[in-house]
């Protein structure tokens, strides 16, 4: 995203769940080290995680979170059991807080981690800090295969979005496109509306990302 509070982390989490549901072996990496939220969404502990890996204190195979970690974590077990494809999703949380975020993101250890994960997973999805807030996203942009911007309609100015795009292009990022968040639709019908609601209503709110998915997938039998 260009700025904070655009629903970026929620959309990233939804994308990871979508890929897992489609049968893709998916790794979600929490690389927003300054304001991490992914671990909270999935009811996980932030430690041990990415920073522990990059500082040489742990191996990714040891700290990756699986469906078992989700089951024993803070999420509703019934919701998890009704979540299709959850076994295909692994998560690397942010890890312990660090002061040298920029140094860590520029490290060869991160390059090595990406290289190893590409051999093991069908898709790797990364959540990182907003482009205009700190240099983290620009730093990471040439380390990944593609970048997607999240733009919250009505909150962030188009000028800021344009500057974010310019900064990424200058860094040789492969900009794949923009997800428009907070769009309201008068007619939300059927399968297409299911996806539309995700991206229209996503915001970084408290609560379980799994429970929100369960409602969208028809897991809530109250209606």
What are the residue ranges of the model-derived segments?
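P-loop NTP-binding module
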Residues: 1-223
């Amino acid at each position: 995203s260009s700025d904070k509070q655009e629903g970026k982390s929620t959309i990233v989490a939804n994308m990871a769940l979508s890929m897992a549901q489609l049968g893709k072996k998916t790794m979600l990496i929490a690389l927003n080290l300054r304001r991490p939220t992914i671990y909270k969404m999935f009811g996980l502990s932030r430690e041990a995680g990415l920073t522990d890996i990059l500082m040489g204190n742990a191996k990714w195979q040891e700290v990756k979170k699986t469906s078992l970690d989700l089951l024993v974590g803070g999420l509703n077990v019934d919701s998890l059991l009704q979540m299709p494809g959850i076994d295909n999703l692994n998560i690397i949380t942010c890890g312990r807080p660090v002061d040298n975020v920029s140094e860590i993101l520029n490290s060869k250890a991160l390059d090595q981690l990406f290289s190893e994960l590409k051999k093991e997973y069908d898709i790797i999805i990364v959540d990182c800090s907003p482009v205009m807030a700190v240099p983290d996203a620009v730093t990471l942009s040439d380390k990944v295969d593609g970048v997607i911007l999240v733009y919250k309609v009505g909150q962030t100015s188009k000028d800021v979005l344009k500057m974010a795009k310019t900064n990424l292009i200058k860094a040789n990022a492969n900009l794949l496109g923009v997800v428009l968040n907070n769009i309201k639709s008068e007619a939300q019908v059927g399968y297409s509306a299911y996806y539309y609601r995700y991206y229209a209503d996503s915001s970084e709110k408290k609560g379980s990302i799994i429970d929100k998915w369960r409602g969208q997938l028809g897991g809530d039998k109250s209606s």
